[in-house]
Amino acid sequence: MNHDFNQDFFSLFGLPRRFAIDAAGLDAAWRAAAAQVHPDRYAASSDADKRSALMLATRVNEGYQTLKSPLNRARYLLQLSGVDTQEENNTRMPADFLMAQMEWRESIDDARADVDALESLSRRLRGEVRDLQTELEAALDARADLDAAAVLVRKLRFMEKLDQEIGDAIESLLD
């Protein structure tokens, strides 16, 4: 059993190194790769081959989770290009984006007791997330503007946190 553990996730699944990917193609490639390296297929193999199969199965699943998520896929593309998104230590954002974040948080706080209002906010937020993903696709695939893409990744991370907050609020009301 000889596999290249250093190949990037796009190569692992036979996909072009782009932000815009064919989700169905990724799913099919993941299923095929996962079946090929499933540890049960190596039950009668040597311990070394079993370990190798387990490591590769883990890598296949990690790759799938990374590429399936637009945020993680964008981070990964930037990482492959040597760009650190600095999400932990660079919280500088354009003033208009910060104002929008404050408005979102106020709207969430105002709607905390109303499932319908929270679900409406969630739909609006998902629309904004789709817009950011479209901007990310343009920055990464069309323009190769890595600095702009890093800022968009930080914005998308903020938006995903808001979506989680809305989801948590809805869940607490339904419990």
Swiss-Prot record:
User: What Gene Ontology cellular component terms go with this record?
Assistant: iron-sulfur cluster transfer complex
UniProt xrefs under PROSITE patterns: DNAJ_2
Pfam families registered for this protein in UniProt: HSCB_C
GO process annotations (BP): [2Fe-2S] cluster assembly; protein complex oligomerization; protein folding
Superkingdom of the source species: Bacteria
- Annotated keywords: Chaperone
Instruction: Please list the residue ranges annotated as the J domain.
Output: 8-80
GO MF annotations for this entry? Answer: ATPase activator activity; protein-folding chaperone binding
The record, for Gene3D superfamilies, names: DnaJ domain, HscB, C-terminal domain
- Please explain the role this protein plays, according to its UniProt record: Co-chaperone involved in the maturation of iron-sulfur cluster-containing proteins. Seems to help targeting proteins to be folded toward HscA.
Q: Which family does it belong to?
A: Belongs to the HscB family.
Q: How does it assemble?
A: Interacts with HscA and stimulates its ATPase activity.
What is the protein's name according to its record? Answer: Co-chaperone protein HscB homolog
Q: Which species?
A: Chromobacterium violaceum (strain ATCC 12472 / DSM 30191 / JCM 1249 / CCUG 213 / NBRC 12614 / NCIMB 9131 / NCTC 9757 / MK)
Which lineage ranks, top first, belong to the organism behind this chain? Bacteria, Pseudomonadati, Pseudomonadota, Betaproteobacteria, Neisseriales
